[in-house]
């Protein structure tokens, strides 16, 4: 058992190269909170990339500018206050103990019940810091040895490479898309649910959106349809469509699917993610596509519910929903034969490495010959290279080559470095 003596939080704001568009909105910076913990003489610090727009658009709309980030940071601070003096056997015990009080705290700050993903997003750094001190205490050097017994059957892969999933948001140019295809990309994540400039949710907004989405997918398809890849089962570049809950009805979704069929891209669609907002519980199992749950799935109960609604894949986001919750989610998903993948949240390099560790043991998608992972921070942060310098000394980053990250023994044995001292300690000065 470990006892938590100290749990502190700091934060830094990281600018984005250009406005980052999704869910019909745009971001210009991402706050990085940093949690530092001390447990029985063991220390760890971990960042958390805050994404208010992704985790709860209602908070983003109600509290514009930096106010939403301030609320999420306050939730992290409240968690740290609660954790001091607590003891735990394994870190995954802590989140269930924190959630009820943190939901009440967020309600006090916002005046409404926030999405559970908002709370989980705030806890990513705290959760990884707790796993880090736990690994230090138990001498764990490989991620596979950190995986709880309950998740071991679900995480029995050992990928030697991970296909990189780049993010093709609204503003990515034709030249860049062509370059991605020609340099080895096998699975492109394409943002749909385009903003229309009209009243959000109105009939005009929805109709313009679906027309823009069809045009966008068609333009991308025409750029890369003749490029082959050894990383997919059919040898073609595949598309992962992420609507972030923008679609309003099944009829509107069917308009999109008809457009995809007409352009001859049906066999390219690997995943369609979150076409509808969480409260629109439409059954999608009748369509010949794999629908993927992301922000609507933040617990085992949510995963089971989405599977009943016809969803056949789940986006694991250890770097957004916490490592602890992701262990539970992959277990529930794989028990039902559901596909999984590790998606990004435009996180910093440190969290990207944790995501790689999780992805390296997660089963490959049915359309892929290798595992896969989404990483897009290097294309979006102005200070990506400076943030890489905050990684632990001696930690070797596996770089992309021909569309995939090559994983070796140094990577698989690198957890002891990843859980040790890193550059994020500097945000706390001398304690």
Question: Language-model features: where?
Answer:
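Metal-dependent enolase-superfamily TIM-barrel catalytic cores that perform enediolate-based chemistry
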Residues: 148-279
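Histidine/acidic-residue-rich catalytic or RNA/ligand-binding cores of hydrolases
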Residues: 55-56, 307, 325-329, 351-361
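Conserved, mostly hydrophobic/aromatic
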Residues: 35, 41, 126, 139, ...
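Flexible C-terminal active-site loop/helix
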Residues: 346-431
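Short, Gly/Pro- and small/polar-rich lid/capping loops
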Residues: 1-36
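Glycine-enriched alpha-helix->loop->beta-strand junction motifs that scaffold or abut catalytic
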Residues: 182-186, 261-268, 286-292, 305-315, ...
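Metal- or metallocofactor-binding catalytic centers and their adjacent structured scaffolds
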Residues: 38, 45-138
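A general structural motif
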Residues: 272-276, 293-300, 319-325
């Amino acid at each position: 058992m470990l006892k938590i003596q100290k749990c502190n939080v700091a934060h830094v704001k990281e600018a984005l190269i250009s406005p980052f568009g999704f869910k019909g909105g745009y971001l210009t910076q991402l706050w990085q909170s940093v949690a530092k913990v001390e447990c029985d003489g063991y220390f760890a610090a971990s960042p958390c990339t805050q994404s208010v727009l992704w985790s709860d658009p209602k908070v983003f709309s109600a509290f514009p500018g930096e106010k939403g980030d301030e609320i999420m940071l306050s939730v992290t601070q409240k968690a740290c206050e609660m954790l001091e003096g607590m003891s735990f056997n394994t870190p995954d015990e802590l989140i269930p103990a924190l959630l009820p009080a943190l939901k009440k705290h967020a309600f006090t700050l916002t005046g409404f019940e926030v999405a559970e993903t908002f709370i989980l997003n705030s806890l990513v750094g705290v959760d990884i810091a707790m796993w880090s001190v736990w690994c230090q205490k138990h001498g764990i050097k490989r991620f596979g040895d950190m995986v709880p017994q309950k998740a071991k059957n679900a995480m029995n892969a050992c990928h030697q490479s991970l296909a990189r999933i780049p993010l093709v948001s609204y503003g990515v140019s034709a030249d860049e898309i062509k370059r991605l295809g020609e340099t080895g990309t096998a699975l492109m994540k394409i943002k749909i649910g385009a903003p229309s400039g009209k009243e959000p949710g109105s009939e005009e907004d929805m109709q313009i959106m679906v027309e823009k989405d069809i045009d966008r997918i068609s333009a991308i398809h025409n750029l890369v349809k003749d490029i082959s890849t050894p990383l997919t089962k059919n040898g073609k570049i595949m598309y992962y469509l992420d609507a972030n809950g923008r679609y309003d009805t099944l009829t509107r979704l069917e308009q999109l699917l008809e457009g995809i069929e007409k352009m001859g891209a049906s066999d390219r669609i690997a995943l369609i993610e979150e076409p509808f907002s969480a409260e629109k519980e439409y059954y999608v199992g009748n369509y010949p596509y794999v629908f993927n749950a992301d922000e609507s799935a933040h617990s085992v109960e949510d995963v089971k519910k989405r599977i009943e609604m016809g969803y056949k894949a789940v986006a694991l986001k250890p770097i957004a929903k916490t490592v602890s919750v992701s262990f539970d989610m992959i277990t529930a998903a794989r028990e039902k034969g559901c596909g999984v993948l590790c998606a990004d949240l435009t996180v910093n390099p440190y969290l990207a490495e944790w995501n790689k560790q999780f992805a390296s043991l997660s089963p490959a998608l049915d359309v892929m010959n290798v595992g896969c992972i989404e990483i897009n921070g290097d294309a979006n942060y102005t200070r990506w290279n400076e943030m890489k310098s905050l990684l632990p000394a001696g930690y070797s980053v596996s770089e992309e080559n021909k569309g995939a990250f090559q994983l070796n023994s140094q990577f698989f044995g690198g957890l002891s470095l990843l859980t040790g001292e890193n550059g994020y300690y500097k945000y706390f000065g001398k304690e």
